[in-house]
Amino acid sequence: MDRAVSQVALENDEREAKNTWRLIFRIAILFLTVVTLAISVASLLYSMGASTPSDLVGIPTRISRAEEKITSTLGSNQDVVDRIYKQVALESPLALLNTETTIMNAITSLSYQINGAANNSGWGAPIHDPDYIGGIGKELIVDDASDVTSFYPSAFQEHLNFIPAPTTGSGCTRIPSFDMSATHYCYTHNVILSGCRDHLHSHQYLALGVLRTSATGRVFFSTLRSINLDDTQNRKSCSVSATPLGCDMLCSKATETEEEDYNSAVPTRMVHGRLGFDGQYHEKDLDVTTLFGDWVANYPGVGGGSFIDSRVWFSVYGGLKPNTPSDTVQEGKYVIYKRYNDTCPDEQDYQIRMAKSSYKPGRFGGKRIQQAILSIKVSTSLGEDPVLTVPPNTVTLMGAEGRILTVGTSHFLYQRGSSYFSPALLYPMTVSNKTATLHSPYTFNAFTRPGSIPCQASARCPNSCVTGVYTDPYPLIFYRNHTLRGVFGTMLDGEQARLNPASAVFDSTSRSRITRVSSSSIKAAYTTSTCFKVVKTNKTYCLSIAEISNTLFGEFRIVPLLVEILKDDGVREARSG
């Protein structure tokens, strides 16, 4: 029995010894594992340079900085992508479209000329320098945000004078008309040898030219063809337009004073003429007895015409024969336009009565003075398919001199402020089926003209008068949706007298800093303005052709005043020049 007990005790001792060695082994393994792990962590921290806990605190900051760098890089890349998109999707197609338009205009002009050459009617293909491609007849400044009057004219720039001046003290050059297409420009004025008041004898100067850039980068107007119509005809109130066949001109032929003409019983003789690219001039009488059968006097608007849809469009005005269909359809019609923030205090009924009377001023025997638009098909045959549009007097004021303008895809009629309303007016015009429709006008309250009382520059109430002066505005600044924002022009900055010509940019209520021709006492008269861009330099220029007093050689000298349009912020009414 003792032996059995000893055997059991021995087995227990062996089992206990095994458990002890197992524990020692496990502890050793665990110790080695911990040591190995500690060495590995130490090595890793050493290799990362993060040997202290304070280094770990900076890790989030470093991550944030890295994130900012990545975001900035992505943002820069996005800017590049945006610029590429703008260039590819917007600017390049627009540039191509402008180039295409100019090429198509040139091709159209050439096709007309080829047909003309086949009919022995001349040959030639003038075109502006490439620097101007896409910069003529376009929306030159498209800006939704800037103050319109932050754009302003520079001082007048010296350039080549393309307009002949009087050469004697009794000479007189007056009534300039100008129009410029994508390929060439046209200019005309009246020449009187014995003083500006001679209404029976005159010549008509007519010229065709192109825009050039000099070797030093200066703009100049280069006359290629010109003619002085020195014959027995007395052309008056001529309007000119640049068309694919040259320079089309509409004139009346006067044999009496304006007052005598309005008191006559028959319409005024009118001719459609053309200076071709070959330098030859031809003209044809219009059938005024049919075209102006209800009129006793009819004159072109003096301002330039416009080539639209294969036709040339001119502003015309004159007197209607009483009780004819054209006269009776306007009976009782009127429109009242109001000054900005300066309401007429007269009773409404009185205003309406005076507005109605304004269309029949006493100076012209009580005839209704009517606005109209004449379009003529442009072909090798002059005077082809003339169509007269007479707009309702619920839109237009008393008939007056005017101009048809095309800028981009928009058409406008400027109407001289011969009636009571002093601020410049531009009527939007739509064209369809050879006729035109006028819409409510843009008005430019600070772009006034001098006039006799009660229709002076500050006048605000309807009245009957024949006054004012021709000073057209040119559409310069547009919204991106093609709505007109601002114009450029040269106004006569006087209340009653034709004094102080001053150029500026105008919005509907105010004007920019101005550039004066000279002191406030200088005498002036008609001004007509046109703007364009030198695409190569992205500089915008405006040309104002102005009648300026010139007492030594003739009563007036017609001067082409050239300015660059500059940009400033918050500057108004500064004096320059």
From Swiss-Prot:
Its EC number is 3.2.1.18. The C-terminus (head domain) is involved in binding the cellular receptor. GO terms for molecular function: exo-alpha-sialidase activity; host cell surface receptor binding. GO terms for biological process: symbiont entry into host cell; virion attachment to host cell. Homotetramer; composed of disulfide-linked homodimers. Interacts with F protein trimer. Interacts with host CG-1B; this interaction inhibits viral adsorption and replication rather than internalization. Residues 124-152 are annotated as: Important for interaction with fusion/F protein. The keyword Membrane applies. Pfam families: HN. The chain crosses the membrane at residues 27-47. SUPFAM superfamilies: Sialidases. GO terms for cellular component: host cell plasma membrane; membrane; viral envelope; virion membrane. Mediates the viral entry into the host cell together with fusion/F protein. Attaches the virus to sialic acid-containing cell receptors and thereby initiates infection. Binding of HN protein to the receptor induces a conformational change that allows the F protein to trigger virion/cell membranes fusion. It is found in: Virion membrane; Host cell membrane. It is a single-pass type II membrane protein. Residues 234-239 are annotated as: Involved in neuraminidase activity. InterPro entries: Hemagglutn-neuramid, Hemagglutn/HN, Sialidase_sf. The lineage of its organism: Viruses, Riboviria, Orthornavirae, Negarnaviricota, Haploviricotina. Residues 1-26 are intravirion. Glycans are attached at residues 119, 341, 433, 481, 538. It catalyses: Hydrolysis of alpha-(2->3)-, alpha-(2->6)-, alpha-(2->8)- glycosidic linkages of terminal sialic acid residues in oligosaccharides, glycoproteins, glycolipids, colominic acid and synthetic substrates. Residues 48-577 are virion surface. Its main location: virion. Keywords: Disulfide bond, Glycoprotein, Hemagglutinin, Host cell membrane, Host membrane, Host-virus interaction, Hydrolase, Membrane, Signal-anchor, Transmembrane, Transmembrane helix, Viral attachment to host cell, Viral envelope protein, Virion, Virus entry into host cell. This is Hemagglutinin-neuraminidase. Belongs to the paramyxoviruses hemagglutinin-neuraminidase family. The gene is HN. Disulfide bonds join 172-196, 186-247, 238-251, 344-461, 455-465, 531-542.
